[in-house]
Amino acid sequence: MSNTYAINEGVLTRLHREPAAPLAGEVTVEIQASSINYRDLGIQAGFYPSRGGVVPISDGAGRVIDIGDGVTDLVPGDLVASCFFPFWEAGPATAANHCASLGCEMDGLLRSTATLPASAFLRAPDYLSASEVATLPCAAVTAWAALLTR
C-alpha cells in the first residue's frame, strides 16, 4: 500500500492506494524525499490551471523499484530525480511538451510510491542523498531554460 496525499478544496487528505505496476515506458519509484518550491505554492494558489484532487509536489527523488517494457535508461536500484515536465526533453517550450506536469495536471510526488513515464525521472549521482537530489529539479530546469531557451 502506498501512502499518498492529495489536496481537495484546500484540505490535505491522506489516501491509501495500491501502487500501479509499470506499463511499457513507465517506471515505479519508491519516493524517498520530496521538496516544496514556489511552483508548488503557485499551483495551490491557482496561478496554474490544475485538476482537482491532484497529488501535489513536483520535485522529488527516490530509487527505481520496477521498470516497464522498453525502458532502457533506468534500472531497479537507480537513484533518480523527478522532471516535472516529463514530455519536455529538448528545445523550446511548446503546448505539446507543457501539456502535463507533475503536481499540476499529473499526480505529483507527495506519496511513497509513484509509477510514471520513464521520462519523468533522470538518474542522479549516488554520491548525493535522496534529500539533496529532491532539491534540484526546479532549480535545474530554471537554469537550463535560462541558458538554453532564451
Language-model regions: role of each:
Residues 85-150:
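NAD(P)H dinucleotide-binding glycine-rich loop of Rossmann-like/cofactor-binding domains
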Residues 18-19, 51-58, 101-106, 112:
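Short Gly/Pro-enriched turn/cap motifs at secondary-structure boundaries
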Residues 14, 19, 61-63, 113-115, ...:
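Conserved hydrophobic/aromatic beta-strand scaffold that supports enzyme active sites
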